[in-house]
Amino acid sequence: MKTSIEVRAYQGALPSEFSSLVPPELRDYLRVLPPNCIALGAIGAGMPLGLAIAKRNGTELSANLQALVVTEPCRRQGIGHQLCGMLESLLRQQGICWIRTEYLGSSHVPSLEASFLQSCGFPEPAPGIHVWNGSFDILKELPRIQSLKLPGDYLVIPFQELTCKERVEIAKGNGDWYPPILDPFAEEDLIDRQRSLALRYRDAIIGWMILEPFHVQTLLFKTMFVRQSHQRTGRGIALLAEASRRIVREGQYKDWIFFVEADNADMVRFMQRRIHHPNVQKEILWRTVKAL
């Protein structure tokens, strides 16, 4: 006999019974559920079976699907579709026109996540961010990382040593000689200004490697850029090599992670060519948006 399913909406906080279904990054919702969030829980025979959470984006007419989870034994029974449909209905009632979601998966399009989302009416997910990760021991094994050096007329300096004049010149170049997604000053309060590097050539800044603590032992290679006139001469990989050697010598971080926006096609190709090792893990943050 099929279990009767009840769907409940929650405000204030998620019930502790749903803790096993809450993703790690949303654990705070068990204590306080933000007022701009909608949470639906599916219950059967007194047990939590599924959970869906969406977050409205401020004054925008869009929302992010933050979680849609169904317990393993209850999958493929329509619970996920039911939660998704009810969540979308509530969002429409609140004037929301778009719902977007993203998930981390393999570099291949066919996946359970993609199939489920498409069955719920979402377009086929597209790459949003390419992600590479591994240990610094792997970087030590890559021949070019160890051997490649910058010529003498190039100078690598800590990002925090940029002069006021250089900072102004870089800021002026945003949208001109480098795209906004490679802005080295974006979320500057989060970056490691001591380990992040700037590349100077004949008294002009022509590139940077921005680093950010990602975890206690993991360092994020957040943004790498070299001016187009210097890209064909291998200065980008040389800058990456210099940053890696410094961090390996220091020994504080064990692992690294590299994010590259899918729009940055040149950098994606660069990483695929240069950071190639059987123990380097490659994933993609897939994104899709549905009109309500």
Q: What are the language-model segments listed below?
A:
Residues 23-39, 43-44, 49-62, 66-68, ...:
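A conserved beta-strand-loop-helix scaffold within acyl/acetyltransferase catalytic domains
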Residues 70, 76-93, 226, 232-245, ...:
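Conserved acetyl-CoA-binding loop-helix of GNAT-fold acetyltransferases
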Residues 1-59, 266-280, 284-287:
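Hydrophobic, helix-prone linear segments
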Residues 231-292:
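C-terminal structured domain segments across diverse proteins
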Residues 91-106, 247-260:
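Conserved GNAT acetyl-CoA-binding A-motif
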Residues 129-162, 274-292:
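C-terminal "cap" of GNAT-fold acetyltransferases
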Residues 1-35, 143-181:
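Short amphipathic alpha-helix that is part of the acyltransferase structural core
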Residues 81, 93-97, 105-127, 262-281:
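Conserved active-site alpha-helix within GNAT-family acetyltransferase domains
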